[in-house]
Amino acid sequence: GPTNQKLPSYAHAVGAIYRNSDPSDIAVTAAGGLVGEVVQVWRPRELNTHETEWGFSCMSYEISGALGIKMANPNKDVIAFVGDGSYLLYNSDIYSSVITNNKLIIIVCDNGGHAVINRLQLFKGGKEYNCLLESSNTPNLVGVDFAKHAESMGAKSEQVNSISELEEAFKRAKKSDVTYVISIKTHSYQWLEGSAYWESPTLEIPNTKENEEALKLHKEGKAKQRQGV
């Protein structure tokens, strides 16, 4: 639901958009932490209104995929949820959407790096290592103004600082006749509960308590896998 916390989570941002969306709106996301949050929060109300590229974790599919979906569904609003990491890898189809008059609504959830991989590092008993900008060993850390960047490609855009501002911005985006990009800073460590075993290994010979616990959980999950499938 709505929140007044300083940095909202991915789930808060997705929920804000969902509450103000139309049943015919199509949600698109891929890779990173957004897929898990969108799948739990976004409950489709019509057929063919939820596109999640999950299996191959194709970072930067979000905007390009949304463009293709918009071309196939010109009378529907297509909403792309994208993290800052995926956005930086590939974003030029914002320009493509503008010059071909295929309006998209793009929600950039900026959590300061590749936060889901940072989460994986910690869950597997490791320490933070160059996945979040603030914990990286960089001599000149500068932020990216995603709103201005999108505007330079012809999109309308704005930076918002709260969930209530996000909801109002989304209403403006719905009325826009050109691609509309909304950027919001989100929490780097806050995720929804609910997960399943993922066979992503850790150290076989642990050298810290964190590694030891990660190996224990890994083996417990491995023991529950179906054999020969």
Residue map of PLM features:
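Thiamine diphosphate
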Residues: 36-37, 41-229
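Cofactor-pocket helix-loop regions in the catalytic cores of large enzyme subunits
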Residues: 1-47, 53-55, 91
